[in-house]
Amino acid sequence: MGAGEERPEALGFNPQKEIVYNLLLPYAHRLDRESNELLAQIKGSLGRAVRLRELWPGVLFWTRKLTTYIRLYGRKFSKEDHVLFVKLLYELVTIPKLEISMMQGFARLLISLLKKKELLSREDLQLPWRPLYEMLERILYSKTEHLGLNWFPNSVEGVLKTLVKACRPYFPDDATAEMLQEWLPLMCPFDVTMQKAISYLELFLPTSLPPDLHCKGFRLWFDEFLTLWVSVQNLPQWEGHLVNLFARLANDNIGYIDWDPYVPKIFTRILRSLNLPVGSNQVLVPRQLANAYDIGHAVIWITALMGGPSKTVQKHLTGLFNSITSFYHPSNNGRWLTKLMKLLQRLPCCIIRRLHRERYKKPSWLTPVPESHRLTDQDVTDFVESIMQPVLLAMFSKTGSLEAAQALQNLALMRPELVIPPVLEKTYPALETLTEPHQLTATLSCVIGVARSLVSGGRWFPEGPTHMLPLLMRALPGVDPNDFSKCMITFQFIATFSTLVPLVDCSSLLQERNDLSEVERELCSATAEFEDFVLQFMDRCFALIESSALEQTREETETEKMTHLESLVELGLSSTFSTILTQCSKEIFKVALEKVFNFAVSNIFETRVSGRMVADLCRAAVKCCPVESLKLFLPHCCNVISHLTINDDVMNDEELDKELLWKLQLLSEITRVDGEKLLPYKEQLVQILHRTLHFTCKQGYTLSCNLLHHLLRSSTLIYPTEYCSVPGGFDKPLSDYFPIKDWGKPGDLWNLNIKWHVPSAEEMDFAYYLLDTFLRPELQKLDLYSSGELEMSRDEVQQCLAIVHNCLTGSGNLLPPLHGERVTHLVTSMVSLNETKLFTGIDHDHSRENYRELISKTLRKLLHYILDHSEDDTKSLFLIIKIISDLLQFQGSHKHEFDSRWKSFTLVKKSMENRLHGKKRHIRALLIDRVMLQHELRTLTVEGCEYKKVHQDMLRDLLRLSTSSYGQVRNKAQQAFFTALGTYNFCCRDLIPLVLEFLRPERQDVTQQQFKGALYCLLGNHGGVCLANLHDWECIVQTWPAMISSGLSKAMSLEKPSIVRLFDDLAEKIHRQYETIGLDFSVPEKCIEIAILLQHAASTSSQLPHPEELALAIKRQGEKNVEAVQNYERLVNTLLDCVTQRNLPWKFEHIGIGFLSLLLRDDYVLPVRAIRYLVQCLNHDALIVRKMAISTVAGILKQLKRTHVKETICPYKISGCPKPESKLVGDRPDNQWLLYDSSNLPNTKEAWESCCFVEKTHWGYSSWPQNMLVYAPADQQPKVGRSREEMSEAEQIIYDHFTDEKFVDQLIKFLSLEDRKGKDKFNPRRFCLFKGLFRNYDDAFLPIIKPHLERLVADSHESTQRCAAEIVAGLIRGSKHWTFEKVENLWNFLCELLRTALSNITVETYSDWGTCIATSCESRDPRKLHWLFELLLESPVSGEGGSFVDACRLYVLQGGLAQQEWRVPELLHRLLMCLEPKLTQVYKNVRERIGSVLTYIFMIDVSLPNTAPTKSPHISDFTGRILGKLKPLMDADEEIQNHVMEENGVGEQDERTQAIKLMKTILKWIMASAGRSFCTGVTEQMQLLPLLFKIAPVENDTNYDELKRDAKTCLSLMSQGLLLPVQVPLVLDVLRQTARSSSWHARYTVLTYIQTMVFYNLFIFIHNEESVQGVRWLILQLMEDEQLEVREMAATTLSGLLQCNFLTMDAAMQAHFEALCKTRLPKKRKRESGMVGDTIPSGDLVKRHAGVLGLSACILSSPYDVPTWMPQLLMDLSVHLNDPQPIEMTVKKTLSNFRRTHHDNWQEHKQQFTDDQLIVLTDLLVSPCYYA
């Protein structure tokens, strides 16, 4: 660091990392003192606030201040302070009951403190991981959120995850082991907990431990997780998380892990995850679309594996790009394209990041990459070469060239000599073409990306700079008024190159110096063209301006403003022009200036469009060299204006002379220059202002106001005066300065030498003189007018206001902010809440008049006068609103302007940055811009402003305007009002009562406009403060009830749609933004300990609290908690009062109930009165209210739930087995006791009570948790079967209602109505309601509900059945803790009920019953539900009641068993035995269901690492049995037709028919399991393959029967499966065998299978040489097949495999085909002699055709380029054009395809052929036979 050495002395500490741009500000010397004072204040006050336990407002206020401090100064504090801040915030964030909005605020600050992890090492800081885990568990996996007891914002998940990422490097050494102990027991692959465990591990596991701790880090889990990943084949949801974890691990530990054995698998899976389409008729596996890998992480993983001794990764990467390159061609498009583009853009970016880390980054405590594994130059070159081809294709992609341009920018930093030439090759022709503008925009945006690498040349690419001038000259025609996008990209292109290069003519040096290199001499002579270029560019601009003049482009009637496009062109034009002039030498500048001056003076422009553009150009010229230019322009303009205004009549003209207006406009723009250069002309300028400021013509005085505004700004603001790319400019003699050395040179941060304009005393005097002369008289006039002493017309008032406004915005930073006393009593705090004053370069002069105060006094008086006397003068009111908001906020720059400048700065920085070297090596102009932005940021920082009386008055005025009569006035005033609300501390509390005043129903005098205005003020704007929903009890207690009561106001009318919409928006916004507000604000002791340390670290000790203060603080904290609870209850009661008012319109009642439902909490039970009201709402007339009540009552029941006692058990004691030695997952001796065992069911009271029930299904599968909890025996649990007297008041209310028959009657009636026909589903909210009832009151309500249930079940209507299903599910789940007697009675009743239900099941209701049973079985011990399972397994497929009932019973059964996963092997075996005889079912719906059920039966049979063989059914046994039955089909030769009649004929059918029926069911099973199981049983499926090949049809025809369609689908799904390396030979064997089959359909299908299989397992195949040869042999074999279709398919397959580089076109293959081509055919004569067999192709013809097909396949395998072997093959092919069919056909097709694919780039492809070859080729492609 250039300034790094002397910082500790200046500051008194060594700063961690400060924002360096602060050191370059003109007032930098004052900042250190300022920041030190602020930091001491923050440390003292933050520590004090925490010690006084005042979370709000104290801690919150000072943590915000710390956030602002970081934004202003960076991490400008010592390491010790940094650690203290982090520790304090960590403790604050993890306070258990902290309100969620505070937690998010603290978390965001903590993230920014930890963001730069190199600043704090593990030695400096350690953070525990468990508090974070507990917080995530509490919030992300909240048990009560779905019941509406907690409201979290949507952003909370992202914030928490980022927080964990930030803390992760600092977890202690033993964290990994503890995490594995915590989460491994959750890893049961059939359960949702697997997803949870893996995502926790991905988020928390630390991977950046130093090498000596690896044994405590990733070594503990690496092998286990990697083998798990390798053995999972069907992309379950959690696989993506594992990949993210591996990517991070690899990236943090480059060189410490050997990934080589896994590389083929990694690349195969990444390729599969791109979801590319292969082959013609592919069925995608549904779930793979959603669960593909995140490209960002995949790229990080690839990048981290590169380098090192073995080059396998680069080889695979090249293979990957070879296989997908053709997808990048612009003619291909699909939903996969975005992924491919992202891959292209991210890879180079990651490689650059890695190179930067290895070569340029400052070393820190993080583990460096070992020398042996760093990327070498050769590695980089190989990488760039492998990716270039896809990038060049992607340049013209349909989705735009942005990704390609970003990729090229990074690639050019690494290897310009490989990257830039091909881009230029595409650019030059694109600049010439007129017909393809897209080509031009695409190539130019790519050249802009590589501009810096091109211009700086460097050792790799010295000839780069020579291309610059030709490119610039050729780009000029792009400045084209008719093509907007072309115009903009050309401006950007020219501006980019001019910023990088000084436009100085150095051609004279050729004579003077002889020590120049060849390239330098070439550049010197080229620079002579610069002047020419600048002049031509100006001509183009002038033409553009003339064609966009107003008269040209619009009719008279249209708008006079600029259109959006015009303003963009204006911006592009002026910024490009100003860049060019900044970079010019003096000589060129003079010529240009002359030219602009003549153009501006010799024409008269209209002032709206073309005038603005010309004035901009002139301003740009004047800014570059103010002295010379002003000499030229200013006197000229002044003279013309004076001359034209000599006559006083001009003052009163309505329309002014065009020339006068144009000269005024020109003058007002050219005064936007360095203020001190204007001082010599001040008399002239003042005289002009006197003449023009009081024109009657609005256009005239507006331009004059602009002039005044610009004069004030130029003299009072601080800004840089030049942005040249080299400090000091270019006008040095060439003898001692050589400009070419500065081409593309970055700015040097430490020698920027910015020239600042800082206002001098003389300029200040001039500014005050202007204000005294022009502002004061206007204010006096307005003052008299508003006292009624002076008559003024509206136009005059507006003119006065316009002058006032321009004076204010011109001198914003000169005038001190408004003073006055603070508004107290809004909040009480024991900590000081002072505002921070920042110095922004000007010491305010308090001896002079503060015009801000004066304006505010006059304006308030005027405003009240206008509102009382002429409220319809809206234009004046608009101006007043503008002036008020500027009086409050404006200090020299506007927030929105700053934001857009910051945005464009970031864009330019990104498009030109050098990520490889880093270290802020940006061009000088950008760095200066950034320093200027830093200065503006300081002027705009108005955080935590004190709320003073002055502000209070103005805000009240704004509120009055916001509720005035005119809509537009209200709208503008509201925007200003919202901005101010966000600026002043606690002002909302002062204003809410005033806004609510308008909604009071008692008031008679409120108009509808005021009512609407007040509602809008409550609603707030997008992203700003919303008064209706502040996270604070005191505010909500006022606003919510007021909104509901306003329904009774006179001004409220539901006839007005705008008002109805407003209430809807308000309710919607409150529901969307409400977050649970805290009731408990206590601060734990841990925080206080750190706060004490922090306070001692602050140098000011005056703030240490007294013991009395501390005692008071504890008392206050208690009071605050009590007060919060009181407010909460008050709010609920007030809402109830409001909702129950008579005559309240229904809409408001609904909104009120909605508000009540938001107030449920999990730490405080709802007041009794509200419970009573909500329970009654269950039977409300309105459906929407009933729905809300159902959810709310379910939540109340959760609040009233009594806690059940748990106890710890030892699973090894229960099972009587010792703990296993090695790790074993799945069915082990020590978890057998959890399984369902029908011989040992708890069906007596003793058995039930002695049985240890484990409800959660995942426990015990993987390993046992450290502390295994189960429910304690019944005698320790809360009492069951209580009488009414034993209940609490709240419970009694619910009890009374549900024991009231009438109430229940009505409720059930309502619940069995249908809501939306055909759309209704099983409703989980209603289920929760019933579950809660039966859980809290056990069977108290059963007698009343029983008869209803029996009635509902007997009725087969959809809605009644659904209602029954919801209640039954609630009953079963609610009976979890009932005693045995009660449960037994319940099941006796339920079994009968369910039997009835299942026999009455219909199409509409079967899914509801399925959901019902699945919900009942979820997280329940199967032994508890044995009645249910025995019932369901009685006769799953009986055939009684028809096929439909069978299918439904199976569906319901499947729902129940699937929830039980691995714990019911016995039931699965029983079910399989039932089903096996029934597999030959005739009915399709039953077959499909059986297929699905089989999937679940075999799901548990997985081959994951360390898994014991399962007790559940095994696939292999089952397949063995099936194959025996399918034998008749295997042996048969003829094609299998589906000739089974759908209804069962009499008598036994033959074996064959039975086999066909069986086959259909098996196909359904294979299809169902493709997307669901984890591992594919490849070995088993292989045995079925030959049969599938036989059945599958060849053509795509939809009216094939079911069997054939299914066979085809199965083949498609199987071919996409992921193969493990051991499985590859097995598959190839089956394929070889099938290729010998007698059916050509089978041989044909083998080929389509190969295409997909090889592509989806590409690198696994390539890795194994034998399998590559096997595939090659198979295809060559089939190319000589006797069936024409098979030969053609084989050729297509070959071409595809060549294209993805699986096979290569080597000499051997070429020779093989050429030999086949030469096969002699029998003479034609012989064939014609009437032989019968002349239709059968002879063997020779087949061979010859095979050869031709081979050549054709090679040609078609490179559709987008011409490899060296191509011309010769085309010649070989042409010989066969006249061969007999089918050869002739093949040749023609090939040639026409070749022509189609190479047509686009024929010009460059032509180069590959010799002249003779071209003649033959032209002949072929246009020969007569082509059209024959």
Swiss-Prot record:
The keyword Nucleus applies. InterPro entries: ARM-like, ARM-type_fold, Blm10_mid, HEAT_PSME4, PSME4, PSME4_C. HEAT repeats lie at residues 462-506, 985-1024, 1164-1202, 1339-1377, 1621-1659, 1665-1703. Signal peptide: none annotated. GO terms for cellular component: cytosol; nuclear speck; nucleus; spermatoproteasome complex. Disulfide bonds: none annotated. Gene3D superfamilies: Leucine-rich Repeat Variant. The keyword Transmembrane does not apply. Pfam families: HEAT_PSME4, HEAT_PSME4_mid, PSME4_C. Associated component of the proteasome that specifically recognizes acetylated histones and promotes ATP- and ubiquitin-independent degradation of core histones during DNA damage response. Recognizes and binds acetylated histones via its bromodomain-like (BRDL) region and activates the proteasome by opening the gated channel for substrate entry. Binds to the core proteasome via its C-terminus, which occupies the same binding sites as the proteasomal ATPases, opening the closed structure of the proteasome via an active gating mechanism. This is Proteasome activator complex subunit 4. It comes from Xenopus laevis.
